[in-house]
Amino acid sequence: MKTLTDTFGRKFPYIRLSITDVCNYKCTYCLPQGYKKNPGDTRSFMKGEEIARLTKALSELGVCKIRLTGGEPTVRKDFFDILKDMKQNSNIPKVTMTTNGYRLNKIAKQLHEFGLDGINISIDSLNRETFKKLTGHDRLLEILEGIKILQELNFKNIKVNAVLLKGINDTHADFEKFGNFIKNNEIDFRFIELMQTGDNLDYFKKNHVSSKIFRDYLEKNNWIHQTFGKDAGPSLNFIHPDYKGKFGVIAPYSKDFCKTCNRLRITSRGDLRLCLFGNTGISIRHLLQNDSQKNELVDLILNQLHLKKESHYLELGETGLTKNLSTTGG
């Protein structure tokens, strides 16, 4: 089997597949003014049949995990059709999703029934008012209800992501609140460092804080760093004997962050992106129009990997093509 391997020996069994740029939230660090269509890009989002052809080709390249992202993937009316086809026909062993959770309490049972293998839910604060200020929506209680429903269904792979923000969720009291949340819940909670994108420089300068503050808290409170294989990805994971859940840290500005990169990205309009913050992307959509194009599609993807750089160079202020995280499925 052909596999996705770059010139630095990194393998890419994991694809983050955006199926829409649209998001109904107004998160302060991503889309503070809400979603606005890019007038310079008139292309539609990939159709269900195009996504189906894409995932079948990816399965022949050793891809074993696809994460559906956006925007907010569940705003697509055919979201469950896409999920169902991917689970039944693509030969991809693991299909997961990232969501803001706005419909989670209503669709949790369907997600379970359709065979979703894992879910990442964005919750930047467990304080209802703070959550509302950050997202523009007073939906925290509904999201927590959705998580509870998933747990009652014995849904195992639940992760909660929070962007670490200065003065908002970066105190020991905040960390303890999240710790209490996972103490008796088998949930992986991960803090993600705020990343600079093309349109958030001022916000980044004001609100970025190093994840070291959280790692120091974990060390002080006897959390144990958990190590995995070299293909496990860039997250640092921590366990504690008194907690059912786990803590994680994603620190893109840390040294050697890109050494363990194991993923590629495909945008909702069918562009292959080798890096979230890369300067290059190539459209593969023209090879998603007919089943007979699969071999050509496989070859095109393979031939792009030599262009993948060793690092994202975020520390140099390079944000590449990423205007905001909704456009590339952060």
Residue map of PLM features:
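Residue-level signature of catalytic and energy-coupling elements of molecular machines
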Residues: I19, F189, G270
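Glycine-centered loop/turn positions within well-structured domains
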Residues: Y25, R128-E129, D256, I282
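Residue-level recognition of short loop/turn positions
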Residues: K26, G70, R269-G270
